Amino acid sequence: IRDRFGASDAYMLIEGLHTTTTASLKPGGDIVSPAGPLSIGWPVYFYDENDNVCRGFVSAGHAYSTGDSATLNGMTIGVCVDSAFSGRNDAALIKITNSNYSMSDVVNVSNHTLSNDKYMLVSEGSTIYKVGSTSGYRSGTVTSTNGSVTYRINNQPLTISNVLAV
């Protein structure tokens, strides 16, 4: 169902005598973690401990611990089922637990459709794009690969390697 402007960000499901609105969660859109606001990442499907297929998205591992809630507009929409933040990883797997929300295949602010079926290695000179709740939609040219960056977390150095310079 599209609204009068052609948008289809939400649809109505008729269940008996009541109506449920399902809102789209768009990659690059806002989400709130215990550490503060950040972006919704790629949509994913995964198996839980009972081999049930679950829906969710990837977000920033430095902002979540396992069991933390992900919220949007003050409402819990999911829970972190796994989180990694180390020299090679910065990812959290968020399981969508609120049936009023589902993932969209359209990137927030850019209306580009996602391609979930592949990934590619980029080389120097490639143009890459990113979208985030605080950074907006940006692009850049890869100037080098296999770089590293060091952060200080709790006064301890953390070096992340194999990063791109843009």
What are these regions (language model features)?
Residues 162-166:
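Surface-exposed, low-hydrophobicity beta-strand/loop segments enriched in small/polar/acidic residues
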Residues 1-23:
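Autoinhibitory propeptides
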Residues 24-161:
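Serine endopeptidase catalytic core focused on the charge-relay Asp
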